[in-house]
Amino acid sequence: MWGSLCKAPLLRLRPTFAAVSNVKTIHIKASPDYNEGIDKSKPLKFSTSKASHRHWTVAKSLGSNQQRPWWKVVPLSVFLTTVLLWAIFRKETDIDEAIYKPIEQLQDESENK
């Protein structure tokens, strides 16, 4: 009983191959990207395309709600910059010296204890 009820609507909703192919050709010919006259031996220029950094924004690709407000970005950037500068300019400690010792020397020290 359920099989006969479900088959009829599915058959009516399924588009035919001819209808789908006609829609695809109409869409291809009607789209502004359809270009017969472009010389395909030359490369496309990125600087003039819509993907260029002059045209692209986060709001265009991800939506305007994906942009982070400056008051969230600036403190994180300052913190990471501070940590990086501290790691570069700090003085070496005993721990650093122990880390840079060769493994053989550390094994000899542990055996002598």
Curated annotation (Swiss-Prot):
Q: One Pfam family name from the record?
A: CCSMST1
Q: Which residues cross the membrane?
A: 73-89
Show which residues sit on the Mitochondrial intermembrane side of the membrane: 90-113
Q: Show which residues constitute the signal peptide.
A: 1-18
- InterPro entries under this entry? UQCC4 (IPR029160), UQCC4_vert (IPR023248)
Which segments sit on the Mitochondrial matrix face? 19-72
Q: Does Iron show up as a keyword for this record?
A: no
Which GO BP annotation is one of this protein's?
A: mitochondrial respiratory chain complex III assembly
Assigned keywords, A-Z: Electron transport, Membrane, Mitochondrion, Mitochondrion inner membrane, Respiratory chain, Signal, Transmembrane, Transmembrane helix, Transport
Where in or outside the cell it occurs: the entry states: Mitochondrion inner membrane
Membrane topology classification: Single-pass type I membrane protein
Has the keyword tRNA processing been applied to this entry?
A: no
Q: Assign the protein's first listed, main location to one coarse class.
A: mitochondrion
GO-annotated cellular components? mitochondrial inner membrane
* PANTHER family per record: PROTEIN CCSMST1, UBIQUINOL-CYTOCHROME-C REDUCTASE COMPLEX ASSEMBLY FACTOR 4
Question: What family is reported?
Answer: Belongs to the UQCC4 family.
Q: What does this protein do?
A: Required for the assembly and stability of the mitochondrial ubiquinol-cytochrome c reductase complex (complex III (CIII) or cytochrome b-c1 complex), a multisubunit transmembrane complex that is part of the mitochondrial electron transport chain (ETC) which drives oxidative phosphorylation.
Name the record gives this protein: Ubiquinol-cytochrome-c reductase complex assembly factor 4
| Naturally occurring in which organism (per UniProt) | Xenopus tropicalis
Gene for this chain: uqcc4
